[in-house]
From Swiss-Prot:
Organism: Mus musculus
GO biological process, alphabetically ordered: immunoglobulin mediated immune response
InterPro entries: Ig-like_dom (IPR007110), Ig-like_dom_sf (IPR036179), Ig-like_fold (IPR013783), Ig_sub (IPR003599), Ig_V-set (IPR013106), IgHV (IPR050199)
Lineage, uppermost ranks: Eukaryota, Metazoa, Chordata, Craniata, Vertebrata
Keywords in alphabetical order: Adaptive immunity, Immunity, Immunoglobulin
Signal peptide region: none
Gene3D superfamilies tied to this protein: Immunoglobulins (2.60.40.10)
Note: This chain was isolated from a myeloma protein that binds phosphorylcholine.
Site (H-bond with the phosphate group of phosphorylcholine): residue numbering on this chain: 33, 52
Protein name: Ig heavy chain V region M603
Any one of the GO CC terms: immunoglobulin complex
Domain Ig-like: 1-121
Amino acid sequence: EVKLVESGGGLVQPGGSLRLSCATSGFTFSDFYMEWVRQPPGKRLEWIAASRNKGNKYTTEYSASVKGRFIVSRDTSQSILYLQMNALRAEDTAIYYCARNYYGSTWYFDVWGAGTTVTVSS
């Protein structure tokens, strides 16, 4: 069974940091692009970051809203995807999901975790 399980969310003050984790199982983690997507309260899903395999190395990509503040990485030995979030703002409040990108360069995210909630508030 393919599973993604996010953790690490919580309440943090503006300017603070959090690290989210996405533990994966049931597939060859290193073979897939992995994505982070969030949903702010009352708003649509927003793609924010990706870790993508290009040959034998991984590249990262970010949305303009988080670039320079968030860092996506992966531990292939433990099949875990991470999202280090720095300089957090109130507008980063959201449910954060990791997703597997099945087709690679397209926007077909076939497996999602249940999400972890991040609240940025003083």
